[in-house]
């Protein structure tokens, strides 16, 4: 339910874009994101930091996109958010000597420290890759191609990265955790 709720604003953005254009899609995205945050708060009692960052970015850049009727603001949102996520992961590992991935998932799974470090770097690299692809597509492809990429390409890339992460991590899980 929680994961499905996260996709609703994106799906609504895509549909409204195809029907009406970027200004209306940005407005729909803002409204859906605000409702999503309210539902998360009411149903689960809290909103994760990542969701707060995304929500603030959506409202800020979505408002600029709607007001000026220019897609570039939402395109920069994607770039900035992925750069921020990569930077946070890198700072956690090199600045604080504690990979953020371990802090987020360490209660659920037990892994050797070197694996947490590799995962943290891999996800930082993934976010940098997404950022660079977003920059390329937003600069060299049509607005419609960018909307398709934002709506489906990034989701597919994230799914594949998550799948590879699971396969990689499985080898290092304690034997009793592998059977769960």
Curated annotation (Swiss-Prot):
Gene Ontology CC terms: plasma membrane
Where does the sequence pass through the membrane? 11-31, 52-72, 76-96, 121-141, 149-169
Membrane topology designation:
Multi-pass membrane protein
Looking up Pfam families in the UniProt record yields: IspA
Q: Does the keyword Metal-binding apply?
A: no
Q: Which family does it belong to?
A: Belongs to the YciB family.
Protein's job: Plays a role in cell envelope biogenesis, maintenance of cell envelope integrity and membrane homeostasis.
What InterPro entries is this protein classified in?
A: YciB
Protein name, UniProt field: Inner membrane-spanning protein YciB
Annotated localization = Cell inner membrane
Its main localization is membrane
Keywords from the UniProt entry: Cell inner membrane, Cell membrane, Membrane, Transmembrane, Transmembrane helix
Q: List all disulphide bridges recorded for this chain.
A: none
The gene behind this protein is yciB
What the entry lists under NCBIfam families is as follows: ispZ, PRK00259.1-2
């Amino acid at each position: 339910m929680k994961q499905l709720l996260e996709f609703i604003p994106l799906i609504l953005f895509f549909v409204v874009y195809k029907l009406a254009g970027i200004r209306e899609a940005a407005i729909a995205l803002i409204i859906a994101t605000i409702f999503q945050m309210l539902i998360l708060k009411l149903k689960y009692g809290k909103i994760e930091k990542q969701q707060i960052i995304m929500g603030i970015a959506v409202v800020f850049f979505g408002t600029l996109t709607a007001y000026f009727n220019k897609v570039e603001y939402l395109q920069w949102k994607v770039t900035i958010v992925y750069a921020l996520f990569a930077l946070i992961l890198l700072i956690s590992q090199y600045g604080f000597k504690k990979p953020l991935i371990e802090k987020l998932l360490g209660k659920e799974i037990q892994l050797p420290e070197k694996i947490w470090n590799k995962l943290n770097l891999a996800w930082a690299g993934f976010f940098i890759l997404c950022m660079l692809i977003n920059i390329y597509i937003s600069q060299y492809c049509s607005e419609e191609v960018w909307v398709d990429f934002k709506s489906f390409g990034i989701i597919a890339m994230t799914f594949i990265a998550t799948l590879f992460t699971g396969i990689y991590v499985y080898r290092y899980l304690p034997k009793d955790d592998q059977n769960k």
